[in-house]
Amino acid sequence: MAIRKYKPTTPGLRGSSVADFAEITRSTPEKSLLRPLHKTGGRNNTGRITTRHKGGGHKRQYRLVDFRRHDKDGVPATVAHIEYDPNRTARIALLHYADGAKRYILAPAKLKQGDVVEAGPNADIKPGNNLPMRNIPVGTTIHAVELRPGGGAKMARSAGASVQLVAREGKYAQLRLPSGEIRNVDVRCRATIGEVGNAEQSNINWGKAGRMRWKGVRPTVRGVVMNPVDHPHGGGEGKTSGGRHPVNRNGKPEGRTRRPNKESDKLIVRRRRTGKNKR
């Protein structure tokens, strides 16, 4: 993938860029793998906004991506097409299995049309193949990692993401995550070889607010510029800093939202670096 930059012929195009989609081989998705996708506008079942900054955006259809490839062990599949998916940053690959089935998977870097991929404990160590971590050599870069055996891929699924298998001790494999965290995962869990493709996606400059609206992202308005009726930080004469610790619109403290006593925290060997520890 490469990034195409626009000439500054208008204010919205100044500095903006777009993916060149050179790796895409087909523009129409596989119809049997499509499902309707209904927008919520950030509202819950009572109609109240539970997630701000959501709404609008282009109409989409959901592509059924196979994050659980256990049922196709030992069945080779040919990469028929690399396709665009509006619901994620990564590209997706359409596989035609030898038994006639068709499935989508996340397209790893360097996977191209015509390649043959396979799942199962005896699969080769090459991009796109899916194996249990007990069968993957230490030091291998992987993605689409399960957290529970048979639970489907949960980690390292966005564009350019990857995890490194750094050690294996007993029934656990140690993984180095993109955040720097080192975590134990059951060796029976599966992962796909290679890193997710479309890594240059993070370098795209969207250029104008309108392109974000196409994606369904609404403006983010700071609380300190609102009125007191709208936000606890609102009001004051002139520009003010809010005068209190950051809170949301309901007055609940912002930041540090992760649970400190999550059951799976015992599997963390080394925590990710945060704040001043990032240096």
Swiss-Prot record:
Family under the similarity heading: Belongs to the universal ribosomal protein uL2 family.
Entries under Pfam families matching the protein: Ribosomal_L2 (PF00181), Ribosomal_L2_C (PF03947)
GO molecular function: rRNA binding; structural constituent of ribosome; transferase activity
Biased amino acid composition, Basic and acidic residues: 251-268
Name this protein carries in UniProt: Large ribosomal subunit protein uL2
Any one GO cellular component localisation term in the record: large ribosomal subunit
GO terms of biological process kind: cytoplasmic translation
Biased composition (Basic residues): 269-279
Gene behind the chain: rplB
Keywords: Ribonucleoprotein, Ribosomal protein, RNA-binding, rRNA-binding
Function in brief: One of the primary rRNA binding proteins. Required for association of the 30S and 50S subunits to form the 70S ribosome, for tRNA binding and peptide bond formation. It has been suggested to have peptidyltransferase activity; this is somewhat controversial. Makes several contacts with the 16S rRNA in the 70S ribosome.
Keyword Membrane in record: no
NCBIfam families according to UniProt: rplB_bact (TIGR01171)
Gene source species: Micrococcus luteus (strain ATCC 4698 / DSM 20030 / JCM 1464 / CCM 169 / CCUG 5858 / IAM 1056 / NBRC 3333 / NCIMB 9278 / NCTC 2665 / VKM Ac-2230) (Micrococcus lysodeikticus)
InterPro entries with a match to the protein in the record: NA-bd_OB-fold, Rib_uL2_dom2, Ribosomal_uL2, Ribosomal_uL2_bac/org-type, Ribosomal_uL2_C, Ribosomal_uL2_CS, Ribosomal_uL2_dom3, Ribosomal_uL2_RNA-bd_dom
Domain of life the protein comes from: Bacteria
Chain residue ranges for the region called Disordered: 34-58, 225-279
Ribosomal protein among keywords: yes
Record lineage: Bacteria, Bacillati, Actinomycetota, Actinomycetes, Micrococcales
Subunit structure: Part of the 50S ribosomal subunit. Forms a bridge to the 30S subunit in the 70S ribosome.
